[in-house]
Amino acid sequence: MELNAFTILHIAVFIAVGYYANTHTTVTGSVEGKPNNPNEDIEVSYCRMNCTVENGVSSACSGDCVCVHRDNEPNGICVEITYFGDFGDPSQDPSIDEAAPRESVSKRRSNGES
């Protein structure tokens, strides 16, 4: 009985310490995020190409990609930058009802359609 009580006490202390550690500590270097501003929504994606800058002119990147480099380094990467601020809130679109399904999927399946 003594061993079981001692083991249960250890487990209880372990759970209490773990609970405290998870609820009262923060990750090192974590910063509270700013609220999302729809006017600043952007997506940056790598275009799988590298580029160089010589005499102030960059080598061509394909499509909508632009050459981005750090400081005065001549070598850079091609990225595509998409700005979502112009799209607005999709739930405020007047034609949002046209995008909704006309019939639920469960109804179609019960009728034998796929």
Curated annotation (Swiss-Prot):
Function, as annotated: Salivary chemokine-binding protein which binds to host chemokine CXCL8.
Disulfide bonds: C47-C65, C51-C67, C61-C78
Annotated segments matching region Disordered: 89-114
Biased segments, Basic and acidic residues type: 99-114
CC terms in the record's Gene Ontology section: extracellular region
Keyword terms, alphabetized: Disulfide bond, Glycoprotein, Secreted, Signal
Location of this chain's protein in the cell: Secreted
Native organism: Ixodes ricinus
Major localization listed first in the record, in broad terms: secreted
Positions annotated as glycosylated: N50
Molecular function as annotated in GO: C-X-C chemokine binding
Signal peptide bounds: 1-23
Name the record gives this protein: Evasin P1096
